[in-house]
Design a protein with these regions (language model features):
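Cytoplasmic helix-loop-helix junction between adjacent transmembrane helices
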Residues: 108-144
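Helix-loop junctions at membrane interfaces in 12-TM secondary transporters
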Residues: 97-108, 292-302
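Short amphipathic helix-loop junctions that connect adjacent transmembrane helices
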Residues: 35-49, 229-245
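Symmetry-related core transmembrane helices of the 12-TM Major Facilitator Superfamily/SLC fold
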Residues: 168-187, 359-377
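A late C-terminal transmembrane helix in Major Facilitator Superfamily
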Residues: 325-367
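Structural signature of the two symmetry-related core transmembrane helices
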Residues: 80-94, 275-290
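Helix-to-loop junctions at the C-terminal end of transmembrane segments
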Residues: 65-78, 161, 260-272, 352
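Conserved MFS/SLC helix-loop-helix module at the cytosolic interface between two early adjacent transmembrane helices
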Residues: 64-103
Length: 382
């Protein structure tokens, strides 16, 4: 990706809003899907293991998407890759609720995982270049807009589930509402040149100082992905809440994550990325353990909020650090992180099926402790 950015002719406000909107779009799609997982599970008559297998397909799709992301950025640049993968993501979301069988749902998740990860890599490549061009930390703020999307999407999902709007209409309306803004954001993004070197590369795991970043990204993102996929099911199955209340756990998680990401860049400048990520991971572990022990819905939701606050800086600081090593390094680390966020939920599903939902959530808390230990030693973060 060319570090010299030229700005296309577009209104100044639209130029400034383009990159934040792309992160908001991704968060909205995630939350829209997550908010209706209980309804889709019931419609397809899936048990915890079956649902875990469906979610595993999303993880597989994310892992397989690296060659797609590399091809797109290498041949078209991150700007065009954003439009291509974003349009695919919205189309797949609209179709997901129409999948007639679990097998079709798995195929849809495979495609959704690939499209979402390709979109994520592209917009973070854009964010890293904007950060580099501006000479200041801004990745946490960009990821805060992802949280705005997840929070808004979760609240909208709660309202629409509460009024019993059909999932088919819910997904279709969200996809349609985001399509035009995606096109406008694409038109306002800074032009970039294709990265020919990245386009010729095959998949390669992070190496050298990036190994620890990849491990932190993988383990840390399991918590974020697992809360998105299982928080509603946890509240329904363990505390017997309604489908309208179920998305509130994820809404609290997203709101707390948003609050921390709004000040994340300042925390990084004052304390350093390693200290912020390590401390946050400890807080996230405390939140998960508190949620499992919570006897009431209110306390469980507070636990989800603490978890969101704790994991808030993992992704933005990981992307920022990897971006300093170039687009190829960012894509490799991002793929490991994205694999964790999408492969974690099915693992939690299998654990929940055999040992109970509480055991699955406890695993998430333990992984956060591992992130805290690893982050304290990851010099590449700073």
């Amino acid at each position: 990706m060319n570090s010299e950015l030229s700005v296309p002719a577009a209104p100044a406000r639209l130029q400034q809003a383009a990159a934040p909107f792309l992160f908001l779009l991704l968060g909205t799609v995630f939350a829209t899907w997550a908010a209706r997982i209980p309804a889709i599970r019931d419609a397809q008559q899936l048990n915890a293991a079956d649902l875990g297998l469906v979610l595993l397909c999303g993880g597989i799709g994310s892992v397989l998407s690296f060659p797609i992301a590399s091809f797109q950025i290498g041949h078209f640049g991150a700007r065009k890759a954003t439009l291509q993968s974003g349009a695919a993501l919205l189309s797949i979301l609209a179709l997901q609720a129409w999948m007639p069988t679990p097998v079709c749902l798995m195929a849809g998740m495979l495609a959704m995982g690939a499209a979402a990860c390709s979109f994520d890599v592209a917009i973070n490549a854009i964010g890293a270049e904007l950060e580099k061009a501006g000479g200041r930390s801004m990745m946490s703020m960009l990821h805060a807009w992802f949280c705005v999307g997840t929070f808004g999407g979760a609240l909208l999902g709660s309202v629409l589930a509460g009024v019993q709007l059909d999932v088919h209409w819910h997904f279709a309306l969200v996809a349609l509402a985001l399509a035009l803004p995606l096109w406008l954001a694409f038109g306002a993004l800074p032009h970039d040149a294709p990265d020919a070197a990245l386009g010729k590369r095959s998949f390669a795991l992070p190496h050298g100082p990036l190994v620890m970043l990849g491990v932190i990204a993988f383990c840390g993102s399991i918590a974020e992905g697992s809360i998105g996929s299982w928080s509603g099911v946890f509240l329904v199955d363990r505390l017997h809440v309604s489908d309208g209340v179920a998305p509130l756990g994820y809404a609290a998680f997203a709101a707390a994550m948003l609050a921390v990401r709004l000040v994340g860049d300042r925390l990084k400048e004052r304390f350093g990325a390693r200290a912020v990520v390590a401390t946050g991971a400890l807080l996230a572990a405390l939140g998960v353990y508190g949620t499992v022990a919570a006897p009431t819905v209110t306390l469980a939701v507070i636990g989800f909020a603490l978890t969101g606050a704790g994991v808030a800086t993992v992704f933005p600081f990981m992307f920022s650090a990897a971006g300093r090593y170039g687009a190829a390094s960012l894509a490799g680390v991002a793929t490991m992180g994205y694999s964790g966020s999408l492969m974690g939920p099915p693992v939690i599903g299998f654990v929940a099926h055999h040992f109970g939902m509480a055991a699955g959530m406890l695993l998430v808390g333990t992984l956060n402790l591992a992130v805290a230990a690893a982050a304290a030693k990851a010099k590449a973060l700073d």
